[in-house]
From Swiss-Prot:
This is Large ribosomal subunit protein P1. One of its GO terms (cellular component) is ribonucleoprotein complex. CDD domains: Ribosomal_L12p. Keywords: Ribonucleoprotein, Ribosomal protein. The lineage of its organism: Archaea, Methanobacteriati, Methanobacteriota, Archaeoglobi, Archaeoglobales. Residues 83-98 have a biased composition (Acidic residues). InterPro entries: P1/P2_N_sf, Ribosomal_P1/P2, Ribosomal_P1_arc.
Length: 106
């Protein structure tokens, strides 16, 4: 988990997530650095929009409350269902990417 936390810390500080930066954060925290994990983390996060991933990770709580809201017209329901299906597909893709990260850290 320390590796992911290091990446999140770098991201929140506005720093680039590179092998050297991740190593520096881990070393500053007193963690024994595993070069393979650092390389795998940086490679896995390449092209990932971290802000979007964080936002979507927090989304299921908000989505669960949505069905309790007012009833929608049938046409609106069809649009919402299509939108929800698209969102679910995106979530599945992100979950697969996150699972790939989980495999790296055992």
């Amino acid at each position: 988990m320390e590796y992911v936390y290091a990446a999140l810390l770098l991201h929140s500080a506005g720093k680039e997530i590179t092998e050297d930066n991740v190593k520096a954060v881990l070393e500053a925290a007193g963690v024994e650095v595993d070069e393979a994990r650092v390389k795998a983390l940086v490679a896995a996060l390449e092209g990932v929009n971290i802000d979007e991933a964080i936002q979507k990770a927090a989304m299921p709580m908000a989505v669960a409350a949505a069905p309790a809201a007012a009833a929608a017209a049938p046409a609106e329901e069809a649009k919402e269902e299509a939108k929800e299906e698209e969102e679910e597909e995106e979530e599945v893709k992100e979950e697969e990417a996150i699972e790939g990260l989980g495999a790296l850290f055992g």
